[in-house]
Amino acid sequence: NFGHPREDTCNIILLDEMNLSRPEQYFAEFLSALEKNNPEERLISLSETSLPNAPAMLTEGRKIRVPANVWFIGTANHDETTNELADKTYDRAHVMTLPKQDKRFTIKPFEPANYSYRSLRKAFGKARAERKEEVVKLLKDLTGDAFTEQLGSQFELGWGNRFEKQALDFIPVMLACGASSGEAVDHLLATRIMRPGKVTGRYNVSAETLRNLKGALEDFWISADLAGDPRKSMELLEADIRRLDGRS
């Protein structure tokens, strides 16, 4: 329903340095609500009981609905003053890592542009429809590959419904934006699977186990005919192999 202009506007709520406290506590209800497929069910309780003289748009006089056109973007630093984000936060978010920039770089100029929420959703839906068969096959190949078997047997990790849903949403849009399927899959693997606490950063696996996983990933890339290399995933694996080997 886009009956009012504000309903067709993309609204972004920016939460800076989210992990100075613990998002799993203060943001938990939002994490749960944002995963609801039905926007009408994305409700946040403001009170245990109905509020007197509550605003008309509150559900049951005590719940506020998070509209589909409201997106949350949070920043998180990783240092001694912050808390580590829990798996459930990472797993429900789209993660972008901003690496340290030691050298100056030139920002590409772009003309300002405005996009309505409706136009974005339409573009996302078009990309998903056009690329669905391709992405479903890719995920099927990944699920049946030796790489996935090693994740399960050596790391006790699997894909799950959430990963599949995110991949079906994310990969087609990346392809429509000009990225390769290799870049899209690499980003998902690096942020979902290879990050510390999942595959890397552990003490109950050996460097040899990581080398075997690295080889399996390379083999999958070739068999699936994915463009480029899984650069982000490889960098994480190689850094952790050096750690376990006692090298800096």
Question: What are these regions, as identified by a protein language model?
Answer:
Residues N1-S248:
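C-terminal regulatory/interaction module of P-loop NTP-utilizing enzymes
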